[in-house]
């Protein structure tokens, strides 16, 4: 959580995880594009997973961000928090750790030290699991 000093010089004003989203799909897309390129393309050993996100229902970063926005809103979670955590966990959707792109696991759920963790049937279900 982000903290800001209040008038009493204490830190009680925090950015909540739950609540109304303070961003838009377009802002999430701009943020992604400022940090990464080649959506749904992978390098090295993960190159064989090129197109996995499209197969899972999100062929563009716009579609991916829209899914994040919709799933977060449905659960009362701020989409910008979900999106930021997803980008952190997946290296801006490039992966490279224990989780593979075709698992649609955007939060590293169940992944611990060489264990791939949970797999989900598509992007939306994976995002929903992350949000919940």
Model feature map: region roles:
Residues 2-132:
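Catalytic cores of secreted/periplasmic lytic hydrolases that degrade extracellular macromolecules
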């Amino acid at each position: 959580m982000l903290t800001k000093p209040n008038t009493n010089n204490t830190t009680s004003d925090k950015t909540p995880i739950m609540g109304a989203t303070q961003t838009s799909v377009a802002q999430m897309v701009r943020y992604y594009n400022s940090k990464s390129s080649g959506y749904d393309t992978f390098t090295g050993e993960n190159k064989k997973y090129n197109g996995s996100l499209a197969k899972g229902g999100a062929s563009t970063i716009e579609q991916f961000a829209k899914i994040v926005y919709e799933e977060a809103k449905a659960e009362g979670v701020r989409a910008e928090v979900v999106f930021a955590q997803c980008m952190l966990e997946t290296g801006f959707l490039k992966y490279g750790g224990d989780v593979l792109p075709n698992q649609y696991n955007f939060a590293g759920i169940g992944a611990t030290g060489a264990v791939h963790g949970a797999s989900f049937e598509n992007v939306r279900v994976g995002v929903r699991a992350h949000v919940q």
